[in-house]
A protein has these predicted regions:
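Sec-dependent signal peptide recognition
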Residues: 2-10
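N-terminal signal peptide c-region/cleavage motif recognized by signal peptidases
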Residues: 14-16
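Aromatic-lined ligand-binding clefts that engage carbohydrates, nucleic acids, or primary amines
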Residues: 257-277, 311
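Extracellular Ig-like/FN3 beta-sandwich strand-entry sites
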Residues: 262, 306-308, 883
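Beta-strand-rich extracellular modules
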Residues: 270-272, 314-316, 873
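Short, surface-exposed tryptophan/glycine-enriched loops
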Residues: 298-314
């Protein structure tokens, strides 16, 4: 399954280099056009996918690194030359190209405009980056006033609709780049470039000028000194200053801002510690970052010209030493949006038309690869901690899950199972892991699986390091500078862009780990983490100077793609029928084809961080990536939680934070608990009788009962390029109120989920999009669509609603995923609209499904007749249940039925694979 990236070659050999402006040549898959600025190529990839490339040279446009898989266009299309304009037509699209400028616009088959490039929108400028003579490439498009824009990976700014925001796109801890931009108008743009990129206005953020900042004072929040006049909101060192330094005092700034023009202003903070920013009394930024991982937060605010706005900033250091507030005035490029890359041979993007957004995602995966099936056990509970120090410690945790009969599948061994000076050996420290084979076997005997942490990082002095170094597979700047990590040892990373290095890396972890029986891979720090935290763009550039695929700047966002390829290809070669599971901190377009899930990095244990994970996960999902997860409970704790003797009120907040986060996590693709310092197992949250423990246990049981539904969503992700965690725009694009929301989402086609992200909240406002209707999952009460309700949220429940017409399968009580088949199968049917659901099942651990070994059971609800049809089973596999009991629970307006673990069915049937019709009313 290895993907050896093809050389993409743009050889306009049919065009002489002296071709006149406006001359073009038709080719089998499109046209090549000479403009005054360069050479444009428009290719028909599919009847709804168009590739646009633009280069300065009329002779050569070549690349050897791309996330796009090889393809052979075979699409019927026609060309019409109207003199000043060339029209290309497929069954689903019309593409117009202005001959003298090369400006491209896209229309649907009826001639309705979808998207248009801005005149002069191909911008390719000569540049030198890392000693390479190259180009900066930028493309501008006309923004539609009524559209929202989503995607480009995972951001931590609390935004989902990124239209009007300016974003830096480079991989670093908690921020993941996937260059797919998706519009509410039903199209996507895949920007095929791996270098540092930017979305939006290219002007840098700047300190607020003195003429716009009046009466600014700064004072310690403890009142120890009077306010002092200052010229900027800032503390401490510049980005990349590293750890340590004197601790500044908690401080408050107050003053006013004068807006020079009317429009959208962006404010950005770069900070660690806790920061809050108010404008005219409205809290616009509420952000906390650990001291060693300084990062940005950003907000867009509309201000009116010549008006003053009160500004207040409060900063609590909590181990931090850096704060900087900057702004950007309204862009002169209003009405446009753009993508820019630092290193490019030219503009290169794919226009994908849905118009359903599920189709946009599906065609992104057509270009970059389909997601294989994850093992069934991956959809159970993952228990992790930083870190289990001994084999016995983790084994005791597994045993405690089984003793307590808490549903659970996966234990995670984080870093430093090796000796302190042996990073990269992948060898267990015998003093703490005396019998690795016996430990792994014991975990398996308890019906659990083991994921283990592996880094592409090496300390000098080991056989693995020497083998990599002697082959030329290690990045040298770290070694030359004798750079040390936070533990105090020199280190570097291997060059994942080298096929030979990837093969060597796999051979090392295969011998040390996979052959012992490791079940899954935790590929940490896959940006890669080349410099001490906080990471900087310049640090990434200078410490990845040259790779096997070109300069580090050219490919720097793609490291995780090739690192995942190393493990996926290696394992499929070593054990062809053993499903791969990779968890990676970074990601990129195409990592989904290597059985890779991404988690949101080293986030903090705060309510605001939890709230930001909702749009972070949704942005990542709509970027075409089906598997996302997070550190439930947050990774780094605030001091009030991490102290040895927390105050009772802080301890209660800690427990509730974990419980609410777990409740949210149950309705995400992967359920994973992880964090540092404190024990994260649910029984540590106040004991068996505490509501936090009871809430997590209830939701864990619910997760396992939902497995038939969740695994079907996974089957959809593989077989039909489905999306599990869904921004509301994917299902309700016409409902503007829905698509603006960042704190609600769909989990599959049935569930609308509204997590609780505030301490002591026992209700919250929930908007129910326009549809056939909704039901409260817990009570069964019908709720009108297109309305906002005050939804109850007791400690052990978050607002969850089910769309009318949904059919949701639930399985039996389980202790682990493979304990028994989904028998009996309980179908909850939510009346009010016709509905359908196709249950997907396969063996769960092998790749036999690739050969057709899976089954599907179509289920249909007919609203008018009140009948449920469980259709004839299609396909099969040896291990499938040949027969089972099916219970049906009907929820309707006149018979509200909430979810119950032991529900009384309205009807039951014995199912043997043939169609069964049940009359429910």
């Amino acid at each position: 399954m290895a993907l050896h990236m093809r050389m993409i070659v743009f050889l306009c050999l049919s065009l002489p280099i002296w071709a006149a402006t406006g001359d073009y040549r038709k080719q089998p898959d499109g046209i090549v056009l000479q403009t005054a600025e360069g050479t444009l190529r428009v290719q028909v990839v599919a009847d709804n996918i168009i590739r646009v490339t633009f280069a300065k040279s009329a002779i050569l446009f070549s690349r050897n690194a791309s996330a796009v898989l090889p393809y052979t266009p075979a699409v019927k299309w026609s060309l019409t030359d109207a003199g000043g304009e060339i029209a290309m037509t497929t069954a689903r699209l019309r593409v117009r190209v202005v001959r003298n400028t090369g400006c491209v616009s896209f229309l649907d088959s009826a001639g309705r405009p979808i998207l248009a490039e801005s005149p002069g929108g191909h911008v390719v400028e000569s540049a030198e980056v890392q000693g390479e003579q190259t180009f900066h490439a930028r493309q501008l498009w006309q923004a539609n006033a009524d559209e929202s824009l989503y995607g480009l990976g995972q951001q931590q700014k609390g935004t989902l609709d990124i239209k009007g925001y300016d974003l830096d796109m480079w991989q670093h801890n908690t921020n993941v780049v996937v260059p797919l931009l998706v519009s509410s108008r039903g199209y996507g743009i895949f920007w095929d470039n791996m270098s540092y990129s930017r979305f939006g206005d290219l002007r840098p953020f700047q300190p607020i000028p003195a003429e716009n900042l009046s009466g600014l004072t700064m004072a310690p929040m403890d009142g120890s000194t009077p306010p002092a006049t200052v010229s900027a909101v800032e503390v401490g060192r510049a980005p990349g200053g590293g750890r340590g330094g004197a601790r500044p005092k908690d401080s408050r700034w107050e003053g006013s801002i004068l807006a020079p023009v009317t429009g959208d202003y962006q404010f950005k903070t770069y900070s660690n510690g806790a920061i809050k920013v108010w404008l005219d009394g409205r809290l616009v930024i509420d952000h906390y970052r650990q001291g060693w991982l300084t990062d940005e937060d950003q907000v867009k605010v509309q201000l009116a010209a010549n008006q003053r706005y009160a500004i207040k900033v409060e900063w609590t250091a909590e181990g931090g030493n850096t704060l900087r507030l900057t702004w950007k005035t309204p862009s002169a490029e209003t009405g446009k949006f753009s993508l820019w890359s630092e290193v490019a041979d030219g503009v290169d993007y794919y226009f994908v038309y849905g118009p359903k957004l599920d189709n946009v995602v599906a065609d992104y995966r057509l270009l970059t690869g389909q997601a294989p099936m994850m093992p069934l056990w991956a959809f159970g509970l993952w228990q992790s901690r930083q870190k289990y120090d001994t084999a016995q410690q983790s084994l005791d945790v597994v045993g405690e899950f089984r003793k307590r009969k808490i549903p659970f599948d996966n234990i995670v061994q984080d870093w430093q199972y090796w000796k302190p000076d042996a990073w990269g050996t992948h060898q267990f420290d015998a003093s703490r892991f005396p019998d690795p084979d016996g430990w792994i076997k014991a975990i398996h005997n308890l019906h659990a699986h083991l994921m283990i942490s592996v880094w592409g990082k090496f300390y000098p002095g080991s056989d693995n390091f020497d083998a990599m170094q002697n082959a030329g597979y290690l990045y040298q700047p770290n070694l030359q500078e004798k750079m040390k990590d936070w533990i105090g040892f020199p280190y570097t990373f291997y060059d994942a862009f080298s096929l030979g290095a990837r093969q060597m890396f796999w051979s090392q972890i295969d011998k040390a780990l996979f052959q012992r029986g490791i079940d899954a891979w935790w590929m940490d720090a896959t940006e890669p983490d080349l410099t001490p935290s906080p990471p900087t763009l310049e640090g990434q550039r200078t410490h990845m100077p040259q790779t096997a695929m070109g300069t580090g700047s050219r490919v720097m966002n793609g490291y995780a793609l090739y690192n995942s390829e190393a493990v996926y290809d290696g394992q499929r070669s070593a054990a062809p029928n053993h499903r791969v599971f990779i968890l990676t901190r970074s990601g990129f377009a195409g990592t989904q084809r290597y059985a890779s899930a991404t988690w949101s990095g080293d986030i903090t244990s705060t309510w605001t961080a939890m709230a930001k994970q909702i749009p972070a996960g949704l942005g990542f999902s709509i970027s075409g990536m089906p598997y996302w997860t997070q550190d439930i409970g947050g990774y780094t704790m605030q001091q009030k939680f991490s102290t040895r003797t927390p105050k009772p009120e802080d301890e209660e907040e800690w427990r509730e934070l974990n419980a609410r986060w777990f409740e949210f996590g149950v309705f995400t693709p992967l359920l994973r608990v992880h964090g540092e310092l404190r024990v994260r197992e649910m029984w540590a949250l106040g004991g068996d009788s505490h509501p936090a423990y009871q809430a997590e246990l209830k939701f864990d049981r619910l997760r396992y009962r939902m497995l038939p539904y969740i695994y079907t969503l996974a089957g959809e992700a593989t077989h039909h390029a489905g999306t599990i965690m869904r921004p509301l725009v994917m299902d309700f694009a016409a409902d503007k109120s829905a698509r603006e929301l960042t704190d609600e989402y769909m989990f599959g086609p049935a569930f609308l989920v509204a997590p609780i992200t505030a301490y002591k909240a026992r209700s919250r406002s929930v908007y129910l999009p326009k549809s056939e209707g909704w039901y409260d999952f817990w009570t069964g009460k019908a709720v009108a669509p297109g309305t906002r309700v005050d939804a109850a949220a007791p400690y052990d429940a978050i607002p969850v609603y089910v769309k009318a017409g949904s059919i949701v399968p639930f399985g039996p009580e389980l202790q682990y995923t493979g304990e028994k088949p989904a028998d009996p199968l309980t179908l909850y049917v939510y009346a009010g609209a016709n509905g359908a659901f196709t249950l997907y099942e396969d063996q769960g651990a092998t790749y036999d499904y690739e050969k057709g070994a899976f089954s599907q059971i179509p289920i249909q609800w007919a609203e008018a007749s009140g009948t449920l049809t469980v259709g004839k089973r299609q396909g099969g596999f040896p291990e499938m249940p040949k027969e089972r009991t099916i219970h049906v629970v009907l929820c309707s307006k006149d018979k509200p039925t909430g979810f119950r673990f032991e529900a009384a069915p309205a009807k039951s049937a014995h199912y043997v694979g043939e169609a069964v019709v049940l009359q429910l009313r």
